[in-house]
Swiss-Prot record:
Keywords: Membrane, Transmembrane, Transmembrane helix. Pfam families: TMEM144. It comes from Bos taurus. The gene is TMEM144. SUPFAM superfamilies: Multidrug resistance efflux transporter EmrE. This is Transmembrane protein 144.
Length: 348
């Protein structure tokens, strides 16, 4: 088997694993109360950092590039909104929307060389454009899917940190009631979709520092000259940025709460498991970036988890119901699948 064929096989296998884990990593938390999500976010990020430590030791501690931490900071900032997103529009729809905008941002920045990166070329650019365009179309379809969130599961959802400390100052006196719970149905849908779009754009920018370092490593006049071309060598720095940023946010939250944070011990182990799943999925994504290039991996890996998450939302959590919603989902999935295939074949 040729080296190119091996890279393609490795890249697509890594993509499949990443898709399944990204679409399922929030599921362990669904049955548990997470409150406002701040403490849970810190637990999840601690698990992420521990996985990075193990990977770093396996790779014999490659050189640490501090600039790669910026990508982790961007991811953690985007992750602030995840708990409100899940509370307002549900697990499946939330991942579908932010995944679509994640795909578009990551694809465009790699394809056109934004933020100082080198523009990436593909064998069949027309197919690549079609694939990215279909991701955008699917995102707009998802905006019209209505989700139903049971009151008793309003916060058990997901991973990350949540509303900012400014929001915490205006919370309802009820310790279990947050600003999200006071929104009307229409407001919840608008707020959830808007936050999902913003998070998706930030998620799509998370690999920019790493790709920037790799691109400039080929230039003798750059401070990054000679830097590794193996994406996994940047895992530890990237995940350290995530953990550092989440720690800063959590400490700011504790100050805002006057050293009385809302802790939910029963969610610690599920949160840790969620973090491990996310970290493994991201490692697979790094492998896919190396084997396929970001311009190919982004549309595939960011579109797929929405399908997995929505299946959880439909069959297990009953968040999405009704014939109209099912038809819209089927249409969106067909578009996603077509877009992913176009993107994949653009590399060959």
């Amino acid at each position: 088997m040729s080296s190119n064929a091996t890279d393609l096989t490795t890249g697509f296998i890594a993509s499949i694993v990443a898709i399944v884990l990204f679409g399922s990593n929030f599921v362990p938390l669904k049955k548990y109360e997470t409150g406002d999500g701040m403490f849970l976010q810190w637990v999840l990020c601690a698990a992420i950092w521990l996985v990075a430590l193990v990977v770093n030791l396996i790779l014999h501690c490659p050189k640490f590039w501090p600039f790669a931490m910026v990508g982790g900071c961007i991811w953690a900032t985007g992750n602030i909104a995840v708990v409100p997103i899940i509370k307002t529009i549900g697990l499946g729809l939330g991942i579908l929307i932010w995944g679509s905008f994640n795909a578009l941002t990551g694809w465009a920045s790699s394809r056109f060389g934004w933020f100082g990166m080198d523009a990436e070329e593909v064998a069949k650019p027309v197919l690549n454009y079609i694939g990215a365009g279909l991701s955008v179309v699917s995102a707009f379809i998802f905006l019209f899917i209505k989700s139903e969130i049971p009151n008793n599961t309003y916060s058990v959802d997901t991973t990350p940190l949540i509303s900012e400390h400014v929001i915490n100052k205006t919370q309802d006196p009820d310790p279990d009631c947050s600003w999200v719970d006071k929104l009307s149905t229409a407001q919840s849908h608008l707020v959830g979709c808007s936050l999902a779009v913003i998070s998706g754009i930030l998620y799509g920018s998370t690999f920019v520092p790493i790709i920037y370092i790799k691109d400039h490593s080929k230039r003798n006049d750059s401070i990054y000259a000679g830097a590794s071309q193996n994406d996994l060598d940047y895992i530890f720095a990237h995940f350290s940025g995530i953990f550092l940023t989440s720690t800063v946010y959590f400490l700011a939250y504790c100050v805002a709460m006057k050293n009385n944070p809302k802790l939910h011990p029963e969610a610690v182990l599920p949160g840790f498991l969620s973090g491990v799943l996310w970290a493994i999925a991201t490692c697979c994504w790094f492998i896919a970036n190396r084997s396929l290039s970001a311009v190919v991996s982004f549309p595939i890996i960011t579109a797929g988890p929405g399908f997995i998450a929505t299946m959880w939302g439909v069959f297990m959590f009953k968040e999405i119901q009704g014939r109209k919603n099912y038809l819209l989902m089927m249409l969106a999935f067909c578009i996603i699948l077509t877009g992913a295939l176009c993107t994949a074949f653009s590399k060959i």
